[in-house]
Curated annotation (Swiss-Prot):
Belongs to the VPS10-related sortilin family. Residues 27-1314, 1386-1447 are lumenal. This is Vacuolar protein sorting/targeting protein 10. Pfam families: Sortilin-Vps10 (PF15902), Sortilin_C (PF15901). BNR repeats lie at residues 65-74, 108-119, 386-396, 447-458, 491-500, 723-733, 820-829, 1103-1113.
Length: 1447
């Protein structure tokens, strides 16, 4: 190939365009100009391609206007009612079709460029959540997918419909979607088969239970998801080689590729999967050299080529971002780095644009002073412009003469369409300046190039908006201005060498907004849009058609480039055609391959090599294969191969050098690695595990730890040394050595991030798993407690509640101030003063709330007077303009799942009243069942509400050491309650023996009180429910103990006289030590005894179940602490130690077959006290950490590594020799429970309580304002957890009636489908489903009970203040026991509690006060003492009482 351009690759593009050499006289003196005036801005202006027909959208009036003469005259489109246009969509593959989308089901379409419009029904309402409403088929314009929503219920469910005949008929495609696309969504993409190209559809499907994006999956159907024999015809593609992936959040079509992005809990790192046929997918691999990751909101898929994908990944602070640009190989899988320090803005736009019509050329802006910007986030960027002619292999400066030119690009968009170029061959324009770097836009001039950017010249002074016409023979520009002072347009007929001006008619002066023309830039007609004074908007039609008489002929044509035009082609809507010619390959046609970097003209290995499929399967590290030489042909390069050896010929490589290289053979041994923490005087540790997500590319197991000790008064001392390990405790090093760290706060949702506060306003943080550390200045002093609150979706959004002091009337007054940052602390804005706490309550999952919603508890006035009541305020715009007081006289609030629970004063009852809200704006009270009187001195505890209902514990016995209560269960919106379990045990602080089992929906363990013994102690029994608390049973006892000795009693299923009873939540030293683990479905451990009731813990033995509590067996004598590993294939037990009883040992016990056999492993030569055993919270690691103290007082950790036991990965469950067995619960599930004011009678039927009435229609419709209808009460209601469909629906066997005022909607629903009625009536809060996932991300696996109404400090100098549980006046406790996760899809759970207290005395403090205290761990140390923080944890907020205000 011949080289064209500086440093160009070896191909040449010949563009047959125009060349003119003669001069003709203008027919007229200038263009014809016509002005039209409008009251509102003409937005979304669109040409029908290859025509003069233009449409625009008046969004103020919701009307569409049309012009058929390139903007000269305008009128509203015919056949469409006024005020219905929600959006305007142009057909992507048919230049005569467009759609007017309304906010209803009836829309309008045109097939004749808008001349006439026809109504059509989309079979679904327009989605308000999705940008892309219509998805078009690239091969058949009649095939369209409509992404809509079904709002038959209170909340809207996203659905997709489709048509194969241009909406003559629309059919349902799929429900519960997050977007659907045709496989053939690009003209270049093909599945390889014509029938699949025509039919294949891809949908992102929401989980049937979980509303969270981490549970979404990709589904493919070739017959529109139809059912055959009751089965939906769909399949899940093997995104990750041999299995599907959950967490699919987006799909993009890029030329001939489909890209799918997935996410997972614990991290914002995403995985990108690529296919070029929808069948074979690959995970996009980025070079290992610099550790670049694709994070949510931090990557941009650029305009790709026909033969590769280009991606820019942000790698710096979000407030002043820069990126790295990568280009893939030809199948879109392996990316190599093209350019570092690309210029980006906060919206993800990248200063990058390809030159239109010419492959391989693009302009990009980079940051020259990148080191300063990385170090100091507020530094001004010095932006420079570069160009490449070989698709990013080499880059060059652009120059005007000898002066370097820098141009404003995509991050400063000043017009519609492309920034620099158009289909006009070789013509490029831009606004910029000469010099060392890019100046402000207002200081720029207009520059032009007619050789595709190889050379430039200044065209006009000042910044301009510009366009190309007549395939480049005409350039038009209008000066840019912030004022309405522009009264002329400029134009050039010689590629910008000379310019003329034309004045706007009648002395019109305007502020230019856009200038545009046809998409192919072949027209001589342009449209200028501008504004002048007030609400005057002008559409100016410019027609240069009469400017010259001569039309270009064949002898005016030559190979591009062509200049000095004095004729017009006048071939409107005919595009220039590029031709290519291939030459012999040279070094310039090759670049470094994946994980190779260029050095001294060679490509050196900088990371693992990719082996061909099957090359290193079952191979040893020294096995060799033919692999990459380090070079690859530049994607898309079609050079002719010469004879002989090639630069990219495969060479010999070793399997030890490849990605996922073979593991060394298993040794069969467990290894123990000890690390002594020298000079440590304290006796405990704060431990923070940085959990990984499924989409994480890291394989480390990082733990952060520091020594701590709790004083008798509850305060905590900490050592200043903070330690880090990246290999689960084999090696430790000290971090932040010179800093006096005060508090350590893991990010509640994104576990790669941890924040460290100091005694000053300096805050350190890491976002890459403690690899690197950055700092920011907080807006106020940290005060006591956790000052930070995090957003569930936006990693960089922070709320800081700190202490501010100022002089008021000569006296210093201190208060808490809430500040908000949207760029991870680089910039702060004050939200509220005199605030108690604030939380982000907006979330993408809860579509009924604004993503920006914040709820705060603050004082009504800005003072600290005792009579200053507290109020709940909310905002949907960060308190910039929106600030609404929602409730007054509030004591506190707590968030749990989708509920916001508020405790407010009830002055009539002289106590507290509880309210709840779903949307953060409307709060409603709850109704308790008949005969359940609630004293104002009672305590309320909200238990885990993960299964579509609130479990509310109400204390009924208040005597100290005898406290107990009833668990009431709500309907799905938390307003009416029925009895679930009476006489449930709680401690003196109203923490409850209640736990939902992780990994299985609906399985709950409680301890109930059956009386007193002779000493006056409570007699407790353990009960279990397998249908979310509707029915309870005792635990069946094993027949014999671990030694084979029979117990003193026996029972097949467990009964009052003989059952297994377990020590529960209230007796745990560490409130996070749960019975089960996230990744181990059905497996539970506990210690207790066999008999008629629970015995002393000193006499307890250890038991386990592998079937979720159906059967149990004894595994150890005495009480042992357990830890799960490798998804339950490893369980480790250690003797339980307490402060009073230090169990000493030098070995641990473990099983690798679910407790069938147990082995001991000696980890120490002398006996030591094991303070704790920890591992990754989900139970997926094969490493464990023992935290020990020796007899001579040394504190140390021991890593136990079980990876040596085996090197064989488990075989696929579907294979014949599978290592898995299919397990499913066998307990019968009841799908119904008693309704409000109904209870089980002696015949186990739900009967109306004597003297009471069922929930009335008026009450139901009032409490559910969006409900359309109600059923006459039958006595039954569905368990909110159940997902059953059809069958015996006991709540719907009665007659349905419309709510008042909803008669018309009722009739429409009744005529639509039973499914619609189901959603409208049965599930009034829709997406309350499966909030167990919410816990996994919101509250991780923290099982510490959140004490509402208390304040405590996690900092070493902040006392743990103990607050009362019950006051004489009133006490209401709202305690959140955080949710469990479903077996197949759910990963972890939590049982943390939150309590809203009215004040009083007594009670110990478990958590830190002030705002969202997220303590650290899954394992804590002593009763009444604080939990240590693990990254998984979210201890929730302490809902403070009045004494919290002391700051």
């Amino acid at each position: 190939m011949r080289i064209w351009g500086r440093g160009a690759a070896s191909w040449r593009t010949l563009l047959f365009v125009l060349s003119w050499t003669t001069t003709t006289l203008a027919k007229d003196d200038g263009p014809t100009i016509k002005v039209s005036k409008f009251k509102h801005p003409p937005l979304n202006m669109n040409y029908f391609e290859d025509s003069d027909v233009v449409l625009f959208h008046d969004m103020s009036e919701n009307n569409i206007y049309r012009s058929d003469d390139a903007g000269v005259s305008w009128g509203k489109v015919a056949g469409v009612p006024d005020g219905v246009a929600y959006t305007l969509a142009m057909h992507e593959f048919d230049n005569s079709r467009a759609f007017i989308i309304t906010d209803r089901r009836e829309h309008f379409k045109t097939t004749d460029r808008g001349k006439s419009w026809e109504k059509f029904d989309s079979a679904a309402q327009t989605s308000r959540y999705r940008d892309q409403i219509l998805s078009f088929h690239a091969g058949d314009p009649d095939r369209v997918i409509f992404n809509g929503m079904d709002c038959a219920g209170i909340f809207c469910n996203e659905v997709a419909t489709y048509t194969t005949n241009n909406f003559k008929e629309a059919k349902t495609l799929r429900g519960s979607t997050e977007g659907c696309w045709w496989a053939k969504s690009s003209e270049l993409f093909t599945t390889g088969k014509d029938d699949l190209d025509r039919q294949r559809v891809l949908c992102i499907g929401a989980d049937s239970i979980s509303p969270f994006k981490e549970d979404q999956r990709l589904f493919i159907s070739d017959n529109f998801f139809e059912k055959i024999d009751g089965q939906v015809q769909q399949f899940e593609p093997n995104l990750d080689t041999n299995h599907g992936i959950q967490g699919v959040v987006n799909l993009a079509v890029v030329k001939k590729y489909l890209l799918v992005a997935t996410t997972s809990i614990n991290t914002d790192e995403m995985s990108l999967f690529v296919t070029d046929d929808t069948l074979k997918w690959h995970r996009a691999m980025f070079p290992a050299a610099h550790g670049h990751k694709v994070n949510q909101g931090a990557y941009t898929v650029l305009e790709g080529t026909n033969y590769s994908i280009q991606v820019d990944v942000m790698n710096t602070r979000p407030s002043n971002p820069m990126g790295v640009m990568f280009t893939s190989n030809s199948n879109g899988t392996f990316f190599v780095e093209n350019l570092e320090h690309t210029n980006r803005n906060e919206r993800g736009n990248v200063d990058f644009e390809k030159i239109s019509g010419i492959q391989g050329i693009f302009l990009v802006n980079t940051v020259k002073n990148w080191e300063d910007v990385e170090k100091h986030g507020g530094s001004r960027k010095e932006v420079v412009t570069q160009i490449t002619f070989d698709d990013g292999r080499t880059f060059h400066d652009i120059k005007a003469g000898d002066d370097r030119v820098h141009l404003h690009s995509v991050t400063h968009l000043d017009n519609v369409g492309r920034v620099f170029s158009s289909p006009a061959p070789g013509l490029v324009m831009g606004v910029g300046n000469t010099g060392g770097s890019l100046n402000d836009f207002e200081e720029g001039n207009l520059f032009v190039s007619d050789d595709a950017g190889a050379s430039w010249k200044k065209a006009l002074d000042g910044p301009h908006k510009y366009e190309f016409g007549d395939q480049g023979s005409l350039l038009v520009a209008v000066k840019d201005s912030k004022k309405d002072d522009v009264g002329e347009v400029s134009y050039s007929l010689d590629h910008g060498l000379n310019w003329k001006t034309a004045a706007l008619p009648d002395g019109l002066k305007l502020k230019p907004e856009i200038i545009t023309t046809t998409q192919d830039s072949t027209s001589l007609k342009f449209i200028l849009v501008g504004s002048s004074g007030g609400d005057n908007y002008h559409v100016v039609a410019l027609d240069f058609g009469g400017l010259q008489e001569k039309t270009c002929e064949d002898n005016d044509m030559e190979d591009w480039p062509a200049r000095d035009a004095d004729c017009f082609l006048k071939k409107e809507f005919k595009d220039p055609i590029p031709k290519t010619e291939d030459c012999e390959c040279s070094d310039a046609d090759f670049e470094c391959d994946y994980n190779f970097i260029r050095k001294d003209g060679e490509c050196e290995k900088a990371g693992p090599i990719v082996a061909p499929d099957e090359a290193c399967k079952n191979a040893g590290p020294d096995t060799s294969f033919k692999g990459s030489s380090g070079w690859r042909l530049i994607p898309g390069n079609t050079c002719k191969r010469k004879d002989g050896s090639q630069k990219d010929d495969p060479v010999d490589r070793k399997c030890s050098d490849v990605v996922n290289s073979p593991a060394p053979p298993a040794s069969g041994d467990i290894t123990a690695t000890q690390h002594i923490f020298k000079d440590t005087k304290l006796n405990d540790f704060e431990k923070i595990y940085l959990e990984r997500g499924d989409s994480s590319s890291d394989s480390d197991e990082t733990v952060i730890a520091r020594a701590v000790e709790y004083e008798n008064d509850g305060s905590m001392r900490v050592e200043q040394r903070v330690y880090r390990t990246r290999d689960h405790g084999k090696k430790w090093d000290e971090i932040l050595e010179k800093e006096e760290i005060r508090g350590i706060y893991p990010h509640q949702y994104f576990k790669d991030a941890v924040f460290f506060t100091t005694k000053s306003r300096k805050v350190w943080y890491t976002i890459d798993r403690a690899e690197h550390f950055h700092e920011f200045e907080a807006p106020s002093d940290p005060g006591s407690g956790n000052p930070l609150s995090f957003h569930p979706d936006k990693k960089d959004w922070l709320i800081w509640v700190g202490q501010k002091c100022e002089k008021v009337d000569g006296k210093e007054q201190c208060f808490k101030e809430a500040s908000i940052s949207r760029d991870r602390g680089d910039n702060w804005r004050t939200a509220l003063r005199y605030v108690q706490k604030c939380e982000f309550t907006g979330r993408s999952t809860y579509k009924f709330r604004d993503m920006r919603q914040i709820v705060c508890l603050t004082h009504k006035r800005e003072d600290n007077e005792s009579d200053n009541p507290k109020v709940i305020v909310s905002s949907n715009d960060f308190f910039e303009e929106d600030k609404q007081v929602r409730e007054s006289n509030v004591k506190d609030f707590a968030t749990m799942a989708e509920f916001i629970v508020v405790a407010a004063e009830d002055k009539e009852q002289k106590g507290l009243r509880a309210l709840a809200s779903l949307d953060g704006e409307t709060y409603a009270a709850a109704h308790f069942p008949y005969n359940f009187e609630v004293s104002h001195q009672n305590a309320y505890t909200v238990l885990d509400s993960s299964t579509h209902a609130v479990n509310l514990f109400v204390a009924t016995q208040l005597e100290k050491n005898q406290r107990q209560g009833s668990i009431l269960k709500s309907n799905s919106n938390g307003t009416s309650y029925v009895m679930s379990a009476p006489k449930v045990n709680c401690d003196n602080n109203y923490f409850v023996d209640f736990e939902k089992i992780i990994g299985l929906e609906g399985v709950v363990l409680i301890n109930s009180v059956t009386g007193k013994d002779k000493k006056g102690n409570k007699i407790l029994r353990t009960e279990i429910s397998h249908n979310d608390g509707s029915q309870w049973a005792y635990l069946p006892p094993p027949k014999a103990d671990v030694n084979g000795k029979a117990y003193g009693c026996s029972s097949t299923y467990g009964d009052e006289k003989c059952a297994l009873h377990l020590h529960h939540y209230t007796e745990r030293l560490d409130k996070k030590k749960t019975f089960s683990a996230a990744s181990v479905a059905g497996l539970m451990f506990g210690y207790g005894n066999i008999g008629s009731s629970l015995g002393p813990i000193e006499e307890a033995d250890t038991f386990m179940t592998t079937d979720a509590g159906i059967t149990w067996k004894s595994v150890k004598k005495g009480a042992w602490t357990w830890q799960y590993g490798d998804q339950g294939s490893i369980v480790v037990l250690v003797p339980r130690s307490t402060e009073d009883k230090k169990a000493k040992t030098k070995s641990i016990s473990y099983t690798t077959n679910e407790g069938k056999d147990w082995k001991d492993f000696e980890f120490s030569q002398e006996e030591v006290t094991i303070l704790d055993i920890t591992s990754i919270r989900t139970g997926s690691s094969r490493n464990f950490l023992l935290w020990c103290r020796s007899s001579d007082g040394k504190t140390f950790s021991v890593n136990l590594d079980f990876t040596g036991l085996t090197d064989r990965p488990c075989v696929n469950p579907e294979s014949g020799d599978s290592d898995y067995y299919l397990w499913s619960p066998t307990h019968p599930l009841q799908d119904n429970e008693c309704d409000y004011n109904f209870e089980l009678d002696p015949h186990k039927q739900c009967s109306l309580v004597p003297g009471k009435k069922p929930l009335s229609a008026e009450q139901y419709c009032k409490e559910n304002p969006d409900a359309v209808s109600y059923y006459e009460p039958t006595g039954y209601r569905r368990i909110p957890l159940t997902t059953c469909v059809g069958g015996t629906e006991l709540d719907k066997i009665s007659e349905a009636h419309p709510c008042k005022g909803k008669e018309e909607e009722f009739e429409k629903l009744r005529g639509t489908s039973g499914v619609a009625i189901f959603f409208a009536i049965v599930i009034p809060i829709g997406i309350a489903a499966a909030v167990g996932w919410w816990v996994w991300r919101n509250y991780g696996s923290q099982f510490g009970q959140i004490r509402l109404g208390e304040s405590s400090g996690f900092d070493n100098d902040a006392p743990w203040v103990k607050y009362p549980v019950i006051a004489v006046s009133a006490a209401v406790a709202v305690v959140a026991a955080l949710p469990l996760l479903g077996s197949a899809l759910w990963r972890t759970a939590s049982s943390a509690y939150e309590r809203v207290s009215g004040g009083g005395s007594g009670g110990g403090s478990w958590l830190n006060g002030g705002g969202q205290r997220r303590f650290t761990t899954r394992d804590s140390f002593a009763r009444g003492r604080g939990d240590y923080a693990s990254v998984d944890d979210d201890e929730g907020e302490l809902l403070g009482d009045d004494s919290d205000e002391e700051v």
